[in-house]
Amino acid sequence: MDIRLLIVLLPVLAAASWALYNIGRVALQQFRSM
């Protein structure tokens, strides 16, 4: 595994997981308020 690839992928993965977490949290709130 190339270390440069990891350095590039890490922020992308972090941003993607953060976005998914936020979307899931908002979806749960919408689902509860129904």
Curated annotation (Swiss-Prot):
GO annotations of cellular component type: chloroplast thylakoid membrane; photosystem II
Lumenal side: 1-4
Entry coiled-coil feature ranges: none
Keywords assigned: Chloroplast, Membrane, Photosynthesis, Photosystem II, Plastid, Thylakoid, Transmembrane, Transmembrane helix
Keyword Metal-binding: no
Subcellular location: Plastid, Chloroplast thylakoid membrane
An individual GO BP term: photosynthesis
GO molecular function: manganese ion binding
Stromal face of the membrane: 24-34
Location, primary (coarse class): plastid
Pfam families the UniProt entry points to: PsbY
Membrane-topology annotation of the record: Single-pass membrane protein
Function per UniProt: Loosely associated component of the core of photosystem II (PSII), it is not always seen in crystals. PSII is a light-driven water plastoquinone oxidoreductase, using light energy to abstract electrons from H(2)O, generating a proton gradient subsequently used for ATP formation.
Similarity comment text for this entry: Belongs to the PsbY family.
Protein name: Photosystem II reaction center protein Y
